[in-house]
């Protein structure tokens, strides 16, 4: 009899938790992820598209949610805005030249359960990475920005799908 109850409780948790570690309420079946809004002063014009694609990849491939193109028809809505982009020296060498630069991107996220009209997550995220501006130049900054976006997508996904 005890084994039956333990099995029942274990299976009951599966309605909310997936084996990828993503906890999604069982009544949510679809998610809309509109194009990320970019309010930053980044020299790269496609940060919004890159972050949108990274988020879609995570939420669709690592959960049971399906992508809904119409935000009003989706069970869940993930809205993201890039608020700030900085590229600042962190180490200065001879002749006052930057030897290391840090790219920092700050975003604001709002994740809403539209079925129950409940905000599941609303907060800012910030991530940074460093590169060598002398050796890597603008291409190094661009690659570093891509890495920062990947880190942000991971952080957003983890926060939105974790219960802790």
Predicted regions and their residues:
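Bacterial N-terminal signal peptides that target proteins for export
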Residues: 1-6
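A structural "domain/chain start" motif
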Residues: 8, 14-64, 69, 87, ...
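Surface-exposed short loop/turn segments
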Residues: 19, 61-63, 72-120, 128-140, ...
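Second-shell loop/turn segments in exported
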Residues: 37-45, 135-145
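Compositionally biased, intrinsically disordered linkers/stalks adjacent to structured regions
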Residues: 141-164
């Amino acid at each position: 009899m005890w084994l039956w109850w333990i099995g029942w409780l274990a299976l009951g948790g599966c309605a909310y938790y997936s084996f990828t570690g993503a906890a999604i309420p069982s009544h949510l079946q679809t998610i809309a992820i509109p194009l990320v809004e970019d309010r930053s002063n980044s020299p790269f014009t496609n940060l919004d598209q890159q972050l949108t694609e990274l988020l879609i990849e995570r939420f669709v491939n690592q959960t049971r949610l399906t992508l809904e193109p119409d935000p009003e028809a989706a069970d869940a809505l993930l809205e993201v805005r890039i608020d700030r982009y900085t590229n600042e020296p962190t180490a200065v060498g001879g002749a006052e030249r930057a030897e290391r630069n840090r790219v920092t991107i700050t975003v604001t996220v709002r994740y809403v359960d539209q079925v129950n009209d409940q905000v599941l997550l609303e907060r800012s995220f910030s991530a940074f990475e460093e590169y060598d501006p002398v050796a890597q130049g603008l291409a190094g900054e661009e690659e570093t920005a891509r890495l920062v976006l990947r880190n942000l997508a991971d952080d957003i996904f983890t926060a939105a799908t974790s219960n802790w």
